[in-house]
Amino acid sequence: MLVFKRGIHVVPKLPNSKALLQNGVPNILSSSGFKTVWFDYQRYLCDKLTLATAGQSLESYYPFHILLKTAGNPLQSNIFNLASSIHNNHLFVENILPSAVEHGTNSNAVVKTEPSRLFLSKIKDSFNGSDWEVVKEEMIYRAENEVLGQGWLFLVENNEKKLFILTSNNNGTPYYFPRNQSFDLNSAISIDEFATLKQMKELIGKSTKLNGKVQDWTMPIICVNLWDHAYLHDYGVGNRSKYVKNVLDNLNWSVVNNRIFSGISK
């Protein structure tokens, strides 16, 4: 039996797209801001990825699989950057969408969600007893100070099921640590950062010799888009920290809670 995969990359349809186009994402993005982030820029990226992979075996894969297949090949950096950006932006939009939009005149009303006990417990275990409010402040600080240009802010879960904060420059991915781009190599780096890069290089070399590939089980739990187009329309040049705070204060916890490993098969 022949199995056909899709050969073109398109922006996924959102169940409440009409309300989002009209009202935006409450407390985070205006209708125009959301239109830019999702309907305009995501479509632009999808069109570029379609052209970049046309006629190749990669064209039939989803962006997630494309970024994994191209992350280790410098000759495919263009394709990797497009696929990684598409996937990251999908993660971002997914975790800010309102849980539900009520029908009627007050279409801005949403169902409030809360972080699960498992999430809050993992936060305390992973950050030396700190609560979520403290971790949020740390995420805001690191977004402002570690990503000076374009990039992404993540809260991720590693292979030991511990949570940690990851900042990625440009189109870095949390799934493959040699390409998470947590350091901006276009500028000077500290001695500690150099030591980390050296350790990473040694680990990559060791892993490659053992089985020919690098294994990374890091999974993103929260994603914030730090690219200029995501916030400039609504927040202006000097208010990226306010934007990040609004995102972290208004997450769709139904989505975030489901991203955490619970150890229970569903």
Curated annotation (Swiss-Prot):
InterPro entries: Mn/Fe_SOD_C, Mn/Fe_SOD_N_sf, SOD_C_sf. Keywords: Mitochondrion, Ribonucleoprotein, Ribosomal protein. Component of the mitochondrial ribosome (mitoribosome), a dedicated translation machinery responsible for the synthesis of mitochondrial genome-encoded proteins, including at least some of the essential transmembrane subunits of the mitochondrial respiratory chain. The mitoribosomes are attached to the mitochondrial inner membrane and translation products are cotranslationally integrated into the membrane. Belongs to the mitochondrion-specific ribosomal protein mS42 family. Present with 2060 molecules/cell in log phase SD medium. GO terms for biological process: mitochondrial translation. This is Small ribosomal subunit protein mS42. PANTHER family: 37S RIBOSOMAL PROTEIN S26, MITOCHONDRIAL, SMALL RIBOSOMAL SUBUNIT PROTEIN MS42. One of its GO terms (molecular function) is superoxide dismutase activity. The lineage of its organism: Eukaryota, Fungi, Dikarya, Ascomycota, Saccharomycotina. It is found in: Mitochondrion. The keyword Transport does not apply. GO terms for cellular component: cytoplasm; mitochondrial inner membrane; mitochondrial small ribosomal subunit; mitochondrion. Component of the mitochondrial small ribosomal subunit (mt-SSU). Mature yeast 74S mitochondrial ribosomes consist of a small (37S) and a large (54S) subunit. The 37S small subunit contains a 15S ribosomal RNA (15S mt-rRNA) and 34 different proteins. The 54S large subunit contains a 21S rRNA (21S mt-rRNA) and 46 different proteins. mS42 forms a heterodimer with mS43, building a large protuberance adjacent to the mRNA channel exit in the mt-SSU body.
